[in-house]
Swiss-Prot record:
One of its GO terms (molecular function) is 11-cis retinal binding. It comes from Aquarana catesbeiana (American bullfrog). Residues 1-36, 97-110, 174-202, 275-286 are extracellular. Belongs to the G-protein coupled receptor 1 family. Opsin subfamily. This is Rhodopsin. The gene is RHO. Glycans are attached at residues 2, 15. Pfam families: 7tm_1, Rhodopsin_N.
Amino acid sequence: MNGTEGPNFYVPMSNKTGIVRSPFEYPQYYLAEPWKYSVLAAYMFLLILLGLPINFMTLYVTIQHKKLRTPLNYILLNLAFANHFMVLCGFTITMYTSLHGYFVFGQTGCYFEGFFATLGGEIALWSLVVLAIERYIVVCKPMSNFRFGENHAMMGVAFTWIMALACAVPPLFGWSRYIPEGMQCSCGVDYYTLKPEVNNESFVIYMFVVHFLIPLIIISFCYGRLVCTVKEAAAQQQESATTQKAEKEVTRMVVIMVIFFLICWVPYAYVAFYIFTHQGSEFGPIFMTVPAFFAKSSAIYNPVIYIMLNKQFRNCMITTLCCGKNPFGDEDASSAATSKTEATSVSTSQVSPA
């Protein structure tokens, strides 16, 4: 074995030299130089510095402006809450443990951090799935005159929490477990061992299929159909400037959504799956740490992509920051012009971009 497995941890280094120690009790500077842990702490501080105000403003502005309290924005609000949740309950702990070079809060703290980080990430992921389904139903109209209302939005929010809990709770009760990963200063699901005592193999397969592959397939299908529908609408009315503009906006949004989803999560999922399917192979702590920490940046990308590119929301945020006045123009007029976000149907001459 090229790693050292303990009762509640797995350190990616052989203990032939006798230097491996529990990541809950001793600094892990034999895995990486101290400055690398400082870099991780600085990176987490940056995510906290950016993530807290962005996601807080998203929540605050939506609460302050009634025009933003639309069914679709309930999902966006849930997404921002999940990101804020990740920053407060996950990133702050990871920054502190990185400064110390090991997981100073013990096994209980590891389960706490692993649970809340997983829960927040899964809420965000399934919120993106619900958004994709909503956009598909509204734009592609597979169910004729279906109208996405408040009840549907609340059901969507409840669905994201149910799916997130279905992923984050089992390790707390003996189906898999949370352990320190990579450089041993943050916790996640155990991809490193088969651990038959906790049926780890079956949980990892369940997690990859249900909580990664299926969401990816749904998102890809929905936005793929959305692009095709918009192009068809544009082709039927070449003279319509509104349709042409909507096509460009939708295409841009879809490209950004899919690319950043893949950038954030595929490297982490690939490395985790590689480690799990190559038990006993040699890999360094950096191999898992870099993609794991990079995936955390989704808490910053999500509000920027899904909300900051929303013109109506951006106008409301500017108005809030400028004490009730929009120095860049008439907020009401601008909001009316961009109220396509609230659209729940697609006519032959207009396609709702977001």
